[in-house]
Amino acid sequence: MQPDFLILGCLLCIVLVLQILALLRRSDHTALDHVLREEHRVGRAELREQLETLERQQEVRLASFARSLTDLVARIDQRLDQLTASLGEDARKGRQEASEGQQRFADALGQRLTELTQRNAQSINEMRTTLEQQLHVLRADNAQQLEQIRAIVDEKLQTTLNTRLDSSFKLVSERLEQVQRGLGEMQQLATGVGDLKRVLTHVKSRGTWGEVQLDNILDQTLTQEQYARGVRVCPDASEIVDFAVRLPGRGQYEAPVWLPIDVKCPKEDYERLLDAQEQADQELVRTMGVQLERAIKIQAKSIRDKYIVPPHTTDFAVMFLPTEGLYAETIRRPGLADVLQREYRVVVAGPTTVTALLNSLQMGFRTLAIEQRSSEVWSLLGAVKSEFGKFAGILEKAEKQINTVGKSLGEAGRKTRTIERRLRGVESLSQEQTQVLLDGLDVDAAESDVDSDASF
């Protein structure tokens, strides 16, 4: 609305200016004043009317805008109510569908388990029925063969009867042996399953199973001299740790220092935690997690109080958890591993990490062995140095002797060349003449030897 006011104001100013200019041209000032007053009054009246008109228009527009705004707010409220109702209905339907889906899944799972149980029972019944039928057929077959044997006894000779009897009894024994073998395998399988169940449910058996597992790992990683089973780490106490790694003392003849490794398996607390996680009950999961932490801390405190006795042992011990799941859950608990190391001086290890720990100890053993053998190597090098000095003296003597022999050979060579120079003027004999002459010299030498012997 402001541009309209500006335009009207400009027009009024222009009209006033034109009227003033027109009146200035007149010579009568009184008439000019009268005209100016009249024009000014008329202009003010027109301006007032225009302002009132604009005010009325503005009020009409504001009223229309207020009505439009009220309608818009009402429509928005209505749409919001509809949207809220629609979202609530969708959420209710979603919850209902999720509940129905979970119920269907639970029903399907229960039905599946029921079918599986019925199928297993049916399979067992079928196996029992088949076995009974085979035994019945076997009995009938045996009875039939016995009847045939009785009939043949009357018809055949004793030798034929014996042959048939041997054959029949052999067949019967083989089949009975097969049946007995099958029953024995089934009984052995059932016994093995029962033993495994007792091992996994009985606390002492679980400990024995963990000890066997740790024993296998130690046997594959270290030598028999580097660890021991059932070690009494403190001579003044009766506590015996499951396993201990033998660390060498500071001196060569000092007693070894033991690194205790004890097997712990709080399986019940861990299984209760797994059941709570499967039920998706956060409060129960938290409670079972706290119980598992408490059980681990109790075992760590027991290890600290029983097996950590410096200087007979190291100032820490190793708690071996025989399953990777239990070890991972223990490490996953916030701050539990730090508390065990700081307060109880216990390091938690699983089947994989204990292997890495033992490998690092094995490298330490090798380094220590190299350090211990370095003095022996140094002594051996000293002995080699002494012998090498003697060998150097022998080489010097040999060199002198070789030089002496070389000088003798050189002197002989010079004398030989001197004799050759002096004999250059002597005529050489043929090979036959030389041989005859040498033979004659040999005969003369032999005769002279005989004469000398005779004279004696």
Swiss-Prot record:
Keyword Nucleus on entry: no
UniProt family annotation: Belongs to the RmuC family.
Coiled coil: 36-60, 106-158
Gene expressing this chain: rmuC
Protein name in UniProt: DNA recombination protein RmuC homolog
General function of this protein: Involved in DNA recombination.
Region forming the signal peptide: none
Alphabetized Pfam families for the sequence: RmuC
Superkingdom as given in the UniProt entry: Bacteria
Keywords per UniProt: Coiled coil, DNA recombination
UniProt GO BP: DNA recombination
Keyword Lyase: no
Family matches, as InterPro entries: DNA_recombination_RmuC
